[in-house]
């Protein structure tokens, strides 16, 4: 994930320099309006057209999906469990098969990559050779008609990727590749999360003792909604020299279709779990089989132990040296590096519940339970996930049934 965050801040500064160059060029010449108009839609579209404002429609429960996954390590993270090695993608399939539902998948993932690198073989904001992704993308374009579902996610932080990596444009390119081949397909944006303990230096989080994970999650939800809305429009900001010089040229991304892009609210489910852990309902069970009480940190691969329970401190609190305190903390597994962004086996289980509920439009209550979770905790998590998914207006799922 970190490579995708490097140089994005510097990229923004370079854009300002390009705009100054643009101002100088405008003093020398004036581009005819026809030239700019011709540059505004450079991806030819011979595909079906369905124009209009995207409307989030309710989804009837599905009996099977053929899904193509596009993303980075928060899609492909692996963990060991009693079921063997699991990933998000494999666990969604396990859940589906347990219900007698169809599940077929393909994937196009690369650790730490924004959608730009997955489409064009290199990112815009930093140097990385991802050329091996181009043949995979071309293969997807050639076989897209085999899929009825597309799940994509973006590198973090999303607000920086929107500007420096032209996220909406590349989301649109993948969207059009699928929609042109299968107009009845559905496209989903997988909303992820920020570092639980604020360990990402490229997101410019406040110092650790002031870092408010929940507030950051709530604030960043709008970035995901903005990306989904932009990708569903037939006019998106196109990368290239015009964009670098400050001219917002537009492209349809390969089609004029404007069906909605739905959101898989994994990040929102984590926020809901955060809240319920602090204020449990009478039916909640957070007692883990090993005798401990579930914490949000249990969802992550290797967070710090003994994170100060009174953080974040209020603005009025006496200032301290957070770096010195964090330096004394140890990750749960001292033999490995601190990791507060990737998922543990329990985290993969939780996020897979969110994906199953959203993609199939079905309650996850009653899905298989690993012994590490236990029946009581599993039912609490399954009920919470269904409440989040079925009440999120961007998920495309609504239901009257409750736990």
List PLM regions with ranges:
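N-terminal secretory signal peptides that target proteins for export/translocation
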Residues: 1-17
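Bacterial N-terminal signal peptides
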Residues: 24-33
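Serine-esterase "nucleophile elbow" of acetyl-processing enzymes
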Residues: 45-109
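Short connector loops at secondary-structure junctions
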Residues: 102-120, 268-271
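Glycine-rich, highly charged phosphate/nucleotide-binding loops
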Residues: 123-141
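Alpha-helical cap/lid subdomain in secreted, periplasmic
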Residues: 136-341, 345
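A cross-kingdom marker for long, charged
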Residues: 365, 369-403
């Amino acid at each position: 994930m970190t490579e995708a965050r490097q140089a994005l801040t510097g990229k923004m500064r370079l854009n300002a320099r390009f705009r100054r160059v643009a101002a100088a060029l405008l003093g020398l010449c004036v581009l005819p309006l026809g030239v700019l108009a011709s540059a505004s839609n450079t991806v030819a579209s011979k595909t079906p057209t369905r124009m209009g404002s995207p409307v989030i429609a309710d989804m009837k429960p599905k009996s099977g999906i053929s899904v193509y996954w596009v993303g980075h390590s928060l899609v492909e993270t692996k963990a060991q469990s009693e079921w063997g090695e699991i990933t998000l993608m494999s666990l969604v399939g396990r859940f589906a098969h347990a219900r007698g539902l169809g599940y077929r998948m393909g994937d196009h993932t690369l650790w730490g990559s924004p959608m730009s690198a997955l489409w064009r073989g290199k990112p815009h904001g930093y140097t990385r050779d991802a050329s091996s992704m181009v043949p995979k993308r071309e293969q997807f374009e050639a076989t897209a008609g085999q899929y009825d579902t597309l799940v994509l996610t973006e590198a973090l932080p999303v607000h920086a990727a929107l500007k420096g990596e032209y996220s909406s444009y590349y989301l649109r390119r993948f969207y059009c590749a699928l929609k042109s081949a299968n107009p009845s397909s559905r496209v989903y944006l997988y909303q992820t999360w920020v570092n639980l303990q604020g360990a990402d230096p490229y997101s410019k989080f406040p110092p650790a003792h002031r870092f408010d994970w929940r507030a950051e999650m709530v604030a960043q939800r709008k970035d995901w909604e903005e990306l989904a809305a932009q990708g569903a429009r037939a006019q998106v900001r196109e990368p290239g020299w015009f964009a670098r010089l400050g001219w917002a040229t537009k492209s349809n991304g390969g089609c004029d279709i404007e069906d909605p892009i739905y959101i898989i609210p994994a990040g929102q489910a984590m926020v809901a779990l955060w809240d319920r852990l602090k204020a449990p309902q009478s039916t909640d069970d957070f007692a883990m089989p090993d005798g401990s009480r579930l914490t949000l940190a249990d969802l992550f691969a290797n967070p710090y132990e003994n994170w100060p329970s009174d953080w974040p401190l209020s603005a009025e609190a006496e200032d301290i040296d957070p770096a010195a305190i964090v330096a004394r903390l140890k990750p749960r597994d001292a033999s490995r590096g601190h990791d507060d962004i990737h998922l543990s086996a329990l985290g993969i289980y939780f996020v897979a519940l969110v994906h199953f509920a959203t993609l199939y439009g079905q309650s996850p209550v009653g899905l298989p339970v690993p012994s590490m979770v236990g029946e009581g905790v599993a039912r609490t998590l399954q009920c919470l996930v269904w409440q989040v998914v079925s009440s999120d207006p961007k998920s495309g799922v609504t239901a009257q049934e409750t736990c």
